């Protein structure tokens, strides 16, 4: 892997999208604050540099900036604020006030080359704008490449590989944004598309083997995508030196424990210890209906159970595997170069007590979620595991509204299983970000046969999303909803009514608790 793009985050909400678009083009990228020193950047040897957008004005005191010499280290692309920063540093004119552009806009291409290779001069394209300031005059030695109304929407240096666009090419609303980014990667930076799951696995396996040697490793397995892929990757590197611990909280979905055991033991040959702690969790939750208190009870109980299990199973272990992903690692105040709240400097992981001084192995810390799924597929994990929807840490406890009881969990498990089975049968599962059933703490009157019933209500939730930050309810075909409702009412004892949640996020959250 020789090609890599350095993204300097000037504070944009879209910076992670830039990294994702670059990765989707199979080029490795990392996000760092613009306060990184010139020496550090040169030593990192970027194939290209992208300056992100941001909320500041380039003339603000303390606004993100870069040393001008950075523009000579590698080809540079400035996006939104990044474009204004280049103009400011190179002697152009950036002004605020006047016409502000937010949302979709139409840009006219002035020069059909460089960033706009594949376009035609005079062609209009839809893009996503989010700026108040704009470049009034391009710097000496630069030429405009696109405009929006009377405003410069792109420029380039006449002889150096320095390019900029005022719009957010990384956002899906920019119709040909991916093409524009790929022009920078391949035509201007001459990157090689060598960032692949297989290449990543080879590099990570070698790294893990060197780090671990012949020592023992434990992994807390949740059954979710991240911990499962992390375990499979570490197992590929060190085999039976890895022991996984899976805690059955009693709050799992139908047959979930059996599925995890089957995948890990039979399919992958991973040493797995299953801890049956259902009674411990349910006893702790008895009588508690407040969602935040339920979360805390589950969190504290899990820590106690895992510590007991790891003290026995991992008594000789020196390393702990954690499924940290790249969004967790990116420095939280990177635009100002502040310290990261998520980069770990100690061994107190996920609430575990400080005296559990394992060394961390975080094999997925360079990956986004979609890349984790692809690595899992490359490692041979079944699609039912790598393609599964997100599942909350507290499990079904936050999908039983109010007190968690064995009866409520049983009704919810069986309703949820029918729901997901029908979604898969209709071929809709991959189109949905998350789908699940909710047990409501109310009963309703119904009629079955000649008799009156007074039974439980189950709500169904399904949303589409790209990142979980915002979400829209999924528009099921009526016949699918009808089939799901009919099966739940007829096959799950104690349910006589099914409702579908058509709330978007915001204002509603995806989960009910």
From Swiss-Prot:
Q: Which GO terms describe its cellular component?
A: cytosol
Q: Which InterPro entries match?
A: Class_I_gatase-like, GATASE, GMP_synth_C, GMP_synth_GATase, GMP_synthase, GMPS_ATP_PPase_dom, NAD/GMP_synthase, Rossmann-like_a/b/a_fold
User: Which superkingdom heads the taxonomic lineage of this protein's source?
Assistant: Bacteria
Domain (Glutamine amidotransferase type-1): residue spans on this chain = 4-194
The GMPS ATP-PPase domain extends over 195-388
Question: Under which EC number(s) is this enzyme classified?
Answer: 6.3.5.2
- Binding sites annotated in the UniProt record for ATP: 222-228
- What's its job? Catalyzes the synthesis of GMP from XMP.
Q: What is this protein called?
A: GMP synthase [glutamine-hydrolyzing]
Species this protein is from: Gemmatimonas aurantiaca (strain DSM 14586 / JCM 11422 / NBRC 100505 / T-27)
């Amino acid at each position: 892997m020789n090609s890599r793009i350095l993204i300097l985050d000037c504070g944009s909400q879209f910076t992670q999208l830039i990294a994702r678009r670059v990765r989707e083009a199979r080029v490795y990228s990392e996000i760092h604050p613009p306060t990184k020193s010139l020496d550090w950047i040169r030593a990192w040897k970027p194939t290209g540099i992208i300056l992100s957008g941001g909320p500041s004005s380039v003339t603000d005191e303390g606004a993100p900036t870069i040393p001008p010499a950075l523009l000579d280290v590698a080809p540079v692309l400035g996006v939104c604020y990044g474009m204004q920063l280049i103009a400011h540093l190179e002697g152009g004119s950036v002004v605020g006030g006047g016409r502000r552009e937010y949302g979709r806009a139409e840009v006219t291409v002035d020069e059909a080359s460089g960033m706009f290779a594949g376009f035609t001069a005079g062609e209009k394209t839809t893009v996503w704008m989010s700026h108040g300031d704009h470049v009034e005059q391009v710097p000496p030695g630069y030429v405009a490449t696109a405009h929006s109304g009377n405003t410069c929407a792109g420029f380039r240096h006449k002889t150096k590989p320095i390019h900029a666009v005022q719009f957010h090419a990384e956002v899906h609303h920019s119709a040909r944004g991916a093409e524009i980014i790929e022009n920078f990667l391949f035509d201007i930076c001459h990157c090689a598309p060598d960032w692949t799951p297989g290449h990543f696995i080879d590099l990570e396996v070698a790294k893990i083997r060197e780090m671990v040697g012949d020592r023992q490793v434990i992994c807390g397995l949740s059954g979710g995508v991240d911990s499962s892929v992390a375990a499979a990757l570490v197992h590929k590197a060190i085999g039976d030196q890895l022991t996984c611990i899976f805690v059955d909280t009693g709050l799992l979905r139908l047959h979930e424990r059996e599925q995890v055991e089957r995948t890990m033991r039979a399919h992958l040959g991973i040493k797995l210890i299953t801890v049956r702690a259902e009674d411990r969790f349910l006893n702790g939750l008895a009588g508690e209906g407040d969602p935040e208190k339920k979360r805390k009870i589950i969190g504290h109980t899990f820590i106690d159970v895992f510590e007991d299990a790891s003290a026995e199973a991992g008594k000789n272990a020196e390393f702990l595997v954690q499924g940290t992903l790249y969004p967790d690692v990116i420095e939280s105040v990177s635009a100002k170069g502040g310290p990261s709240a998520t980069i770990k400097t100690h061994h107190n992981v996920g609430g575990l007590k400080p005296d559990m001084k394992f060394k961390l192995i975080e094999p997925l810390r360079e990956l986004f979620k979609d890349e984790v799924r692809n690595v899992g597929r490359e490692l041979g994990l079944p699609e039912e595991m790598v393609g599964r929807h997100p599942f909350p840490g507290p499990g079904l406890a936050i999908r039983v509204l109010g007190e968690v009881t064995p009866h409520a969990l049983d009704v919810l498990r069986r309703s949820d299983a029918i729901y997901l089975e029908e979604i898969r049968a209709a071929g809709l599962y991959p189109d949905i970000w998350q789908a699940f059933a909710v047990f409501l703490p109310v009963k309703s009157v119904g009629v079955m046969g000649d008799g009156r019933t007074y039974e439980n209500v189950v709500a169904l939730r399904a949303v589409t999303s790209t990142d979980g930050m915002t979400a829209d309810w999924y528009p099921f075909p009526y016949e699918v909803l009808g089939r799901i409702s009919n099966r739940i009412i007829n096959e799950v004892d104690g349910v006589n009514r099914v409702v579908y949640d058509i709330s978007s996020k915001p204002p509603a959250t995806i989960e009910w608790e």
